[in-house]
């Protein structure tokens, strides 16, 4: 016996009944769907339809709003930045800007307003960083390592 000769035992897979092929077939005329009505039609399920009962999305009150002026900031942990510096993807001797972080692949997404530096991980070198924002713990960690952080968003808010 060869691989191309393998097949199921006779009767292992019952043939599916074809629908709508006469009364004698057992699945003729209405094809087991009963008589008329919504469920007899093609494409039965209607999302959110609860049989005439007021659907849950209309029973619950509306809440909140979407602020169209909200700005999203891409998070970046100092541990990730440190790994990139050690791997040679970011030059620690130069000032590290958001463009340098984007070029190194540390920041993704086109619609982010800037980068926010967060404190997870450790940083071992003195670096000079310019980002949109930084948490207090991240700022303390960078300054403890001998570096400095300049935030652009805070500077813009102070000027306004």
Swiss-Prot record:
Residues 1-11 have a biased composition (Basic and acidic residues). It comes from the Bacteria. InterPro entries: Ribosomal_uL15, Ribosomal_uL15/eL18, Ribosomal_uL15/eL18_sf, Ribosomal_uL15_bac-type, Ribosomal_uL15_CS. Residues 1-39 are annotated as: Disordered. Residues 21-35 have a biased composition (Gly residues). One of its GO terms (molecular function) is rRNA binding. Pfam families: Ribosomal_L27A (PF00828). Keywords: Ribonucleoprotein, Ribosomal protein, RNA-binding, rRNA-binding. Belongs to the universal ribosomal protein uL15 family. Part of the 50S ribosomal subunit. This is Large ribosomal subunit protein uL15. It comes from Granulibacter bethesdensis (strain ATCC BAA-1260 / CGDNIH1). The gene is rplO.
